[in-house]
Amino acid sequence: MVEKNERGKVILQTFDPYHWVIKKVIEYDFKSLYKQELADRKHFNYPPFYKLIKLVLLHKKSGYLFTGAHHLAHQLKKQLGDRVLGPEFTIIPRINTYYQQQILLKLENKLSMTKVKEFVQSTIDIWKKEDYSKSIRVKIDVDPI
């Protein structure tokens, strides 16, 4: 690691060496990089302009998971509409014996996160009473990295 005011060598490994981010880093143009990243985040409704809640659903049978995830997303969309994205399989769709799907909620900062969290939890609690979802595990991640 190179510390401030120290000379050093930094190696960047990338699939696309002509990507605008790599160019800005090579040019030491961090101010421009920051401005562009912030503009992109605003345009695509990401933090710090929006809050994110990620729900990861897990089950040993992909069919149960698929059905349950779609039912939960449908229930969430009734209240939250287009703020609900998914469900879709995670980048790694299966870990050990569990299949994974995720639902992402993109929420305006002006919304009461307390009320949203209460709504999400009550929706999950009602959904968990159905036969198709009783054995599906749900992990909730507020402001995922």
PLM regions: where:
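Accessory helical-bundle/CTD segments and flexible terminal tails appended to RecA-like ATPase motors
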Residues: 2-145
